[in-house]
Amino acid sequence: MAKATGRYNLISPKKDLEKGVVLSDLCNFLVSQTIQGWKVYWAGIEFDVTHKGMALLHRLKTNDFAPAWSMTRNLFPHLFQNPNSTIESPLWALRVILAAGIQDQLIDQSLIEPLAGALGLISDWLLTTNTNHFNMRTQRVKEQLSLKMLSLIRSNILKFINKLDALHVVNYNGLLSSIEIGTQNHTIIITRTNMGFLVELQEPDKSAMNRMKPGPAKFSLLHESTLKAFTQGSSTRMQSLILEFNSSLAI
């Protein structure tokens, strides 16, 4: 009896790319619009980014909030009560998280040049611009970055996402709820909230936290759903998150 098969189907480009990341994947932050928000492709990884939670962030910043939310404003005064702070899009939040993941690798591992230098440049590009393409001019970098190295970078980014997943929602028990990474020009703080991850970018000296004369800060919210697909044992983790839900936290 005849049966249908897919024996000679072409391998989709996406599956093919999963075997290894090429340099161009690290230097392209490809964005397409969706009904819920955006689809982002970077380093062989596809992210679904949503607008969820952003309206609430704007309300907290502009005083248009319920009295019960005042604790959240007081917990992050350098963001919600600082005239020098600005709200960015969730796409920006994802870029900062990816840049932080790269910086985490540079801190954790003794990477050889030119790999460390190249990663530093890619991290700066993600952190300080909103462009979709970074032109890596150095030929030496291109020659020495093997597929194995690039795939290692990708797997380390996924490990960093799991580090974020291991954080607890902001709590009263002293459990770890934030990751902080300092670079030469910035301080990145990523905090676990009920909705996902509150991402902030400050000056190296964290002057935004100076109550008398607050310095500049940028911040945004990346919804839980964007990173959920890349976390290990996410169903168990989701159950524990429900248990530690902080009802007094607006976001």
Curated annotation (Swiss-Prot):
Keywords: Host cell membrane, Host membrane, Host-virus interaction, Inhibition of host innate immune response by virus, Inhibition of host interferon signaling pathway by virus, Inhibition of host STAT1 by virus, Interferon antiviral system evasion, Membrane, Viral immunoevasion, Virion. Changing T50I: In strain: Isolate mouse-adapted. Changing R137A: More than 90% loss of interaction with host KPNA5. Pfam families: Filo_VP24. It is a peripheral membrane protein. Changing V170A: Complete loss of interaction with NP. It is found in: Virion membrane; Host cell membrane; Host endomembrane system. One of its GO terms (molecular function) is structural molecule activity. GO terms for biological process: symbiont-mediated suppression of host innate immune response; symbiont-mediated suppression of host JAK-STAT cascade via inhibition of STAT1 activity; symbiont-mediated suppression of host type I interferon-mediated signaling pathway; viral budding from plasma membrane. One of its GO terms (cellular component) is host cell plasma membrane. Changing L147P: In strain: Isolate guinea pig-adapted. Changing N171A: Complete loss of interaction with NP. Prevents the establishment of cellular antiviral state by blocking the interferon-alpha/beta (IFN-alpha/beta) and IFN-gamma signaling pathways. Blocks the IFN-induced nuclear accumulation of host phosphorylated STAT1 by interacting with the STAT1-binding region of host importins. Alternatively also interacts directly with host STAT1 and may additionally inhibit its non-phosphorylated form. Plays a role in assembly of viral nucleocapsid and virion budding. May act as a minor matrix protein that plays a role in assembly of viral nucleocapsid and virion budding. Interacts with host importins KPNA1, KPNA5 and KPNA6. Interacts with host STAT1. Interacts with host KEAP1; this interaction activates host transcription factor NRF2 by blocking its interaction with KEAP1. Belongs to the filoviridae membrane-associated protein VP24 family. This is Membrane-associated protein VP24.
